[in-house]
Amino acid sequence: MPKTYEYLSPEQVAHFLEHGYIIIKGAFSEEKAAQWTANLWVRLGMDPGDKTTWTRERVHMPVHKRELVETFAPKAWAAIKDLLGGEERIDEHASTWGDSFIVNLGTDELEKATEFVHPRDMDNWHVDGDFFIHYLDSPEQALLVVPIFSNIAHNGGATYISPDGLELIARYLAEHPEGVTPVDLTLIPSTTPHTSNPEQDPGFWSHLKEIKRCSKFVELTGEVGDVVLMHPLMLHTASKNYLRVPRVITNPPVGLKQPFNFNREDEGEYSLVERKTLRALGVDRLEFRPTTERRRIVPERVKIQERMKQEEETRLRNLN
């Protein structure tokens, strides 16, 4: 008997297993989005009506407030539970979303452009999770999530993904049970002796190099309230905003209480993410065991966003 899900339709399940992502349309309301973005421009220190004040092309903003996903976007929360095998597997600390907006404003030069960069040649390809050592079964980043807070049209700075890149990353991580460290747009084996020249390690991985092997690319255009849910190993990149219509998204992580399990006794207990990983590897099951201790990293962005938060709080106080 086919497994039943709280929210996902058979078509959505099939799409996720084939392509590694699904889009939940209208997962939260325009009113909710408007409430959360009401002070966006004050926080940025920019004027929405004066592009000369848009001095940064892309801004990763700090978080000021959070809300349970269950109340903010009930449909997305139901889909997240379906993808990860049930609410009991999800880390309760990863069940909130915040207002840490990622804003893509473009530039004057891009607005005048007549030629556009091919997705394969974009310069920001990566997998998420700059705060931990990566293993195939890492629980810290169990899904890649993109809630959309502004309408995003073609060439308007949408996130691009590469569904066939997921297979490359999965196989790479399966071959590196020692874990790999995310550094800029690369992955470096955690036990490498080549600390000063990591690119000399046979296990060195460059996202910008490996993306050249990919042929499938999807531009995540959408409308306010849409939420894209992706496999955690989905290669993705920011794109250029040629339209200069402000693009606003967030990128909240979802964590698990325990690592993914690719060798369950009952095959019916595999989550959809686990099933997609196994499919990417071309196997029915896999006994994966990390050979080094799991550990977290404090990324440089944390310090940067703390400074940004203090600056934003000052602007908000001055507004009042």
Regions found by a protein language model. Give the residues of each.
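Non-heme Fe(II) oxygenase catalytic core, chiefly the N-lobe of the double-stranded beta-helix
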Residues: 8-11, 16-19, 28-224, 237-246, ...
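Generic N-terminal leader segments that precede the first folded domain
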Residues: 21-23
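Non-heme Fe(II)/2-oxoglutarate
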Residues: 46, 174-188, 210, 223-320
